[in-house]
Amino acid sequence: MAGMPRSRNVPPPPSSRALAPVHRRIVECTRCPRLRTYCRTIAREKRAAFRDEIYWGRPVPGFGDPRARVLVVGLAPAAHGANRTARNFTGDGAGGSGDFLMAAMHAAGFANQPTSRAPGDGLELIDAFIAAAVRCAPPANKPTSQEIANCHPHLVAELAALPRVGVIVALGRVAFDACWRLAAGRGVAPRPKPRFGHGLAYRSDAFPAVIAAYHPSRQNTNTGKLTPGMLREVFEKVRGMI
């Protein structure tokens, strides 16, 4: 019936036994009261275009191929994107960050389609897994340093459950810094810390290679700081690294 709310959006099911307990802990996490309150408030108030949907409104686990050799790390769920759809880089509209990212991944063979619009849209990642430095949507897209630290164990656990990962794509500086905290946790962080720069790659014998990229936010893509070609080049470089 028109006007009736749809069923609640839920994350894709864990793609392996190893990921199942990790994702359960992510979804049940309450470490950051400010973020949990914000996500619930957004889920209740909604955006007019999505008033008939039941927002997810909880922490968002990663998704993708459990045998992935490529891990893509973003910043955090968007308030009306993944906080609504329960899938990272999904639901922020035509030309949004999800479509921008997926077009580049599709061109390099890491996704079966160039768009990411909604749960159940047929999207499948190929040899890739998408996660985030922060699992709850933050106000103004700006988590605090403590919130980033609180969330870091979830990224540690997801990487541990993805044993074939050989390259990590860090979308933005927050994700880039999170990657080096991952390396530090394994006792292999380089000194001084590598410099963030779009397309710069850092290799290590004891940790997955890390390649930096500007985040495909509308702020970056609408201003031309990040173009489709620039992001395609990053994933083409990744293809040559695995």
Summary of predicted features, one role per range:
Residues M1-V10:
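Short Lys/Arg-rich cationic patches that frequently serve as NLS/NoLS or arginine-rich RNA/DNA-binding motifs
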Residues R6, P14-I242:
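A polyanion-binding, active-site-adjacent surface
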